[in-house]
Amino acid sequence: MRKFLKSAIEYLAKDLDLDKELLEQIQYVVIVLTFEFIKCISVILIAGILGYFKESLIVILSMCFIKPFIGGYHEDSQLKCFIATLIITTSIIMLVTFNKLNLFSIVILNLFSIFSIYNKAPVIDSRFPLTKEHLIKKNKILSVTNSSILFLITLIFFKISWISQTITWTLLIQTLLLFNKYKREDS
């Protein structure tokens, strides 16, 4: 599929007179977005077959809203990434199913997540280096803003507990996964 996408982009771009660097960037973005789309749809379909369509949809949408900006956990292949996403989504759905959070718990967990994201995001992965200072700052602002928006959504939808709790657990788990790649400065 990767070769097909690269060839298709090269074919479409040959009349646009793009330089090699821009063409590579376009290819990278299209390939990543295509694989991410397939992964997300697959996870939602599997969860839907098991009766958790709406929960998995909220998990995936919440992840898409914050994950690109906070960094953190990455796998080294599409299959491993799919399996990890499926396990994370299933775990969040189980947490929502078996643990009921009150308003105080939701506020505390979300504030903890936002505080951690503010202090650690974006976590830079060596395979996906973000080296330009202005991009790092932009991602930090977007990660804090988006996690704060998710927190507000949990408060607005508190009476619809499965939405509020699904977003809260997703934000918390994604925040915990930030520390998977965090390296202490003295190590």
Curated annotation (Swiss-Prot):
An example molecular function term from Gene Ontology annotations: peptidase activity
EC number in record: 3.4.-.-
Keyword terms of this UniProt record: Cell membrane, Hydrolase, Membrane, Protease, Quorum sensing, Transmembrane, Transmembrane helix
Gene Ontology cellular-component annotations: plasma membrane
Membrane topology, as annotated: Multi-pass membrane protein
Enzyme class, spelled out: hydrolase
Domain of life: Bacteria
Listed transmembrane segments: 29-49, 50-70, 81-98, 103-120, 149-169
Subcellular location: Cell membrane
Pfam families membership: AgrB (PF04647)
One GO process term, biological-process aspect: quorum sensing
Family that this chain belongs to: Belongs to the AgrB family.
Purpose: May be involved in the proteolytic processing of a quorum sensing system signal molecule precursor.
Name the UniProt record assigns to this protein: Putative AgrB-like protein 1
